[in-house]
């Protein structure tokens, strides 16, 4: 990828243009429309624009011709369709079918280039902010900005590390690639704000330990400086609670359960808010589109290109209840049948998916166009979406204001990047791994207080139960992937009654091979230290299950 791993000094950020930022740079706008490190050092307004660009870039469209490339939430969706709890109806409009079908996942395809280049451009945007602030001479506002730069860089590297790290699978237990090189625990190259041109051309994949230490250092700096922020701008920016949450994620990845438990609790306490209520989650106008209910999220505005495009955004793909979006046109989102069946009927979260006809939960489903009419002496919901959405279809992510007809309103929505609920589950899993029984108690307390007053678990695998409840809680938020890969969980799409498309019914023994992402060929070409040390291509590594 061009200029991905060059020093930011004197180098333009590939793809990070002023259109991705919320403020213009009047006195420092170059002819190319891009931002350089020197400009940031000399212009306060340029620095402000770069800081504003951090949350803005995550919502930006990578390529308007590739409708699956609408930013971080598109990458979240990529991870979701690689699991077995998230099912998409097979349809010609399904832009994400290659990832579900595990095809075109090798290093030479555009699909992989989107993920790789998007993350590294985000890293470079963070590097610009970090490099622009001298902490010894900075104002309080500048120190807060420095903390933001470190937090964003850490968050992006943590995602990349968990996606690109090669872990053993049933396809390649020896962890050797096509060249015979052992790639176990290798992640991706680390590009910092001080990396020079020469070093960038010989920048190897970091080991798990090297990457862990780097991210931990960034989060330590974020923790130190982010307290100087005066506002998290209505949860669109990370704050101290979010930094603690990122640390909890990091320590889980590193299997440091004591620290994961510690920082999950710090995140909960520092945030101070409560988990979403049933009314919050199932509201037909604000259900899972209200950023005030989360620790950190992304908020679309009418000025975002993703909104102006109408169909290249989170709501278009995540919400089944629109007449303008991709999902509403056919490739609707469902929960895997095996997951739905396992949820207790007394757990109110189960109503966020369409119940089978005749189920006692059918009447509890709410639709954005619900309308009760008398039919044969019985009041019946004559919602058109009730008829259109398939059984097990999602009712979780509502269009803004419940407006399913006008994209200019419906997609001016928000999506979550971190919720406090995740921290409760991290705390429970970490506790259970440290002292069996303690985590299950934490889970039971959470479930009975917030999700299912009648909750009881009588099984013998507490870790499995904690992870299951976590996946139900965070369904569609791009996070199940990480637990599947980290905890070596099998993916099971093929079984009697499955609602997966027959060609996507892959069953694995442990984590799937397709969850080890390949580094793109362009990086190999520009960076010899990576060449020959890439992850093996996992495309079509499994045959579909046949009934």
Model-found features: residue ranges?
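Bacterial Sec-dependent N-terminal signal peptides
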Residues: 3-7, 14-45, 215, 248, ...
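Conserved, well-structured interaction surfaces
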Residues: 91-167, 206-211, 221-231, 408-415, ...
